[in-house]
Amino acid sequence: MNSAAQKTSQPVAPYMALGLSTIACGIADRKHIQHNLETVEDVIHAAVSMTNINMPVKVIALAEGALTGFTDEIFDLPHKLAADELFIDVPGEETEFLGRLAKMYNTYIIVQCKARWPEIMDDRFFNTLFIIDPDGQVVHKAAKNHLWCREHSCTPHDIYDRWVEHFGSGIDAF
């Protein structure tokens, strides 16, 4: 066995993965997301400080809606209004905030929120999962394909031609 194969065949050192469910306040304006970010920050600090005692925390997953909540669904807001006034861009200010936490704790942070994808359509938002690496960078982003009936998010299938033009039609595009 060569040294590269030996290195990859070694067991992964034990680590902790945390799933955090925070209280998320509904947002009436994009600036209100900051309150939810501060709550997430406090909970991450507390959870990591308690958990890091036994093993390093390498993955933190936030509950769906932790940043943006579900205001658009609760109040049945028009899609364009919600996209223009409420939801984030990935990457953007909010991912930079979370990126600082990922760097601080040398961990991955997994987030789900409503986000615009201006590279696809600037007046639409998607129920988006993204992953921030320990260097604080967004390394993965995906749009939810199957929505709950009350969800107003756009899906790749709603704008199929534009999506395929940008990402292709392979299974990895969806």
Give the residues covered by each predicted segment:
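Active-site beta-strand/loop signature of hydrolases that rely on acidic residues for catalysis
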Residues: 45-79, 102, 109-110
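Active-site catalytic loop in hydrolytic enzyme cores
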Residues: 116-174
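Well-ordered, non-membrane alpha-helical segments in soluble/globular domains
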Residues: 30-46, 88-96
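A short acidic, glycine-rich active-site loop
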Residues: 81-96, 161-164
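Surface-exposed, active-site-proximal loop segments in enzymatic domains
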Residues: 71-83, 120-131
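Active-site-proximal beta-strand elements of phosphoester/diester hydrolases
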Residues: 12-33, 61, 141-144, 173
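A short, hydrophobic beta-strand-centered structural micro-motif
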Residues: 90-119
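Acidic/histidine-rich helix-loop elements
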Residues: 26-35, 87, 154-161
